[in-house]
């Protein structure tokens, strides 16, 4: 399955039984060999009597392999079955905080507007921030100045002299 798959493995059905014990009296437990990838709370058992289910959901932004062990007990004897869940890495989108809409007077600047960037897989120092203007007459690219470093960045927007209107930066 892919990292961050919303339904994990989906519903996996299995059947339990015992010659001496009614299926509804059997106990099913579970373990995960990699609790960082799949915490025990993310191995959810369901069903009743002989018809049982399990759903395995990896922790967010984790990938790798884990062995899930299901154990059935009648109170005296136990039996185990194992299966492997392989979680493939998925490139997550970088993040950027929202900057509120700005209203400024003609021939003034926004001043530095703070924002932060991040990415689960990429160090922030390796991320590139670019800029654009929907109205280059009002706000030419040269008048959009990026600053800061690491996760903490700023943008200062200075409209062209004697211009007014709206632009999306």
In which residue ranges do the predicted regions lie?
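Extracellular ectodomain surface segments
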Residues: 1-33, 59, 79, 83, ...
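Low-complexity "stalk/linker" and mucin-like segments enriched in Ser/Thr/Pro/Ala/Gly
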Residues: 31-51, 132-152
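Long, low-complexity, Gly/Thr
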Residues: 46-47, 55, 84-85
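Extracellular/luminal low-complexity segments enriched in Ser/Thr/Pro
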Residues: 53-63, 154-166
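Extracellular and select intracellular beta-sandwich modules with Ser/Thr-enriched
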Residues: 65-67, 77-83, 98, 166-168
């Amino acid at each position: 399955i892919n990292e961050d798959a919303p339904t994990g493995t989906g519903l996996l059905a299995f059947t339990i039984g015992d010659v001496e014990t009614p299926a509804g009296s059997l106990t099913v437990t579970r373990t995960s060999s990699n609790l960082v990838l799949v915490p025990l709370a993310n191995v959810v058992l369901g069903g009743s009597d002989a018809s049982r289910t399990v759903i395995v959901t990896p922790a967010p932004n984790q990938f790798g392999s884990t062995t899930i062990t299901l154990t059935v007990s009648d109170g005296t004897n136990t039996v185990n079955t194992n299966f492997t869940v392989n979680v493939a890495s998925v490139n997550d989108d970088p993040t950027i905080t929202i900057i509120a809409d700005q209203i400024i007077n003609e021939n003034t600047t926004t001043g530095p507007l703070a924002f932060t960037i991040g990415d689960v897989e990429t160090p922030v120092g390796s991320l590139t921030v670019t800029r654009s203007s929907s109205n280059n007459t009002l706000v030419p690219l040269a008048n959009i100045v990026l600053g800061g470093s690491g996760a903490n960045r700023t943008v200062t927007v200075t409209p062209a002299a004697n211009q007014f209107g709206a632009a999306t930066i």
